[in-house]
Amino acid sequence: GYQFDKIFPGCRIIDIHEYLLEKGITLQGKGAFLYHDPCHTPMKLQDPMKTVKALLGDGVVKSERCCGEAGTLAVNRPDISTQIRFRKEEEIRKGEAELRGQGLIGPKDNVKVLTSCPACLQGLSRYGEDTANGLLEADYIVIEMARQILGENWMPEYVARANNGGIERVLV
């Protein structure tokens, strides 16, 4: 197990999403998203969906089911992964319909699905053209937050702020 408490007595391990929420860094109401909760979610302090809605606002719909990536599952058992993928595709379309039905995204707007897991991001990226209208854009929650807080050119600004000791430093 982790030995942080022995190396750094009194230290606290916290997920970046929960840390940002604790510091009051949110997007409240700046967009609508699908959220894919990884099978092994890093968010441990409260229900992950509660954390995600607190960070992103109420325009978030949870996309149920495994993405089919599951570490090496897609490589080792593509037969199983493909079946999982078909079920996830149905869930993505349901979520898309819900977002569009609530008027949270336009009829032809792309749908964004956010996650916190590298394997899931890879898996979700495979669904790019599987929505009914528009494309599915997959990304990390923290990347979407950086993009909206820092702008489209967030990367150079992000690096500069991190180098100057800003809150972004914890993400590097």
Listing of model-derived features with the role each one plays in the protein:
Residues G1-V172:
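Iron-sulfur cluster-binding electron-transfer modules in prokaryotic oxidoreductases
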